[in-house]
Regions:
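Catalytic core of non-heme Fe(II) oxygenases with the double-stranded beta-helix
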Residues: 98-212
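Non-heme Fe(II)/2-oxoglutarate
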Residues: 2-110
Length: 212
């Protein structure tokens, strides 16, 4: 199921002293995997958080399930990132938005955050080369830092653009993997148009690793 393409070409970029890896045509059979992962909507992410606008003004869904067939992929990315896997589960993101002024992507960015270590993302939307992943400078605004500590993610996920400095955008492409240091770089999905203000979900598969 999760066979990698033969003769993978790994592009390595050094950005601010950190390696960012990009691999196009990552999976041998991406359509089969996409059908397997995204045939049905995944459960709501953080569905028990309160207060929340998830499934009210937008849908943020995540599949978490174990599949032993994914282990060789995780081991490959672990070796590439030189970090241990944080988990071995299949993990996905599925996101779409209501047409509501709350979802103000023109003036706001979606929930910049950091993770435990390297992140891998495989993009699964065809003909989308815009809504990828943004990397930001370190978050230093005190009010923003307090919000992250005290406000549930899905209650105020949109943050004012002027409070963040975007330093790089990782460009999406169907069946492209990007692997970057999600602890070093605050990051979040790059919503810059209304493509996913519809029945279509923004779909990707994610991998998490942890620094030593």
């Amino acid at each position: 199921m999760f066979e990698l393409s033969d003769n993978l070409e790994i592009n390595t970029e050094i950005f601010q002293g950190s390696k960012i890896f990009t691999i196009d045509n990552f999976y041998e059979n991406p359509d089969e995997i996409s059908d397997y992962l995204f045939k049905e909507p995944a459960p709501l992410h953080k569905e028990y958080d309160n207060p929340t606008y998830n499934n009210v003004l937008f849908e943020d869904r995540r599949l978490r399930t174990y599949d032993v067939r994914l282990q060789p992929v995780i081991n490959f990315l672990s070796k590439l990132s030189s970090q241990k896997p944080l988990l071995y589960d299949i993990t996905t993101n599925q996101t779409r938005f209501n047409d509501d002024e709350f979802n103000d992507y023109k003036n706001c960015i979606w929930w910049p955050h950091v993770d435990e270590g390297y992140n891998g993302i495989v993009y699964f939307n065809k003909n989308d080369t815009e809504c990828g992943t943004n990397l930001y400078s370190e978050i230093t605004d005190v009010s923003e830092m307090n919000d992250y500590d005290n406000i549930p993610e899905h209650f105020a996920p949109w943050r004012q653009k002027e409070k963040y400095q975007k330093i790089k955008t990782l460009i999406p492409e169907y069946n492209r993997l990007v692997l970057f240091d999600g602890y070093k770089f605050p990051h979040g999905m790059n919503i810059i148009n209304d493509r996913y203000f519809s029945d279509e979900y923004r779909n990707n598969q994610v991998f998490f690793f942890e620094r030593a």
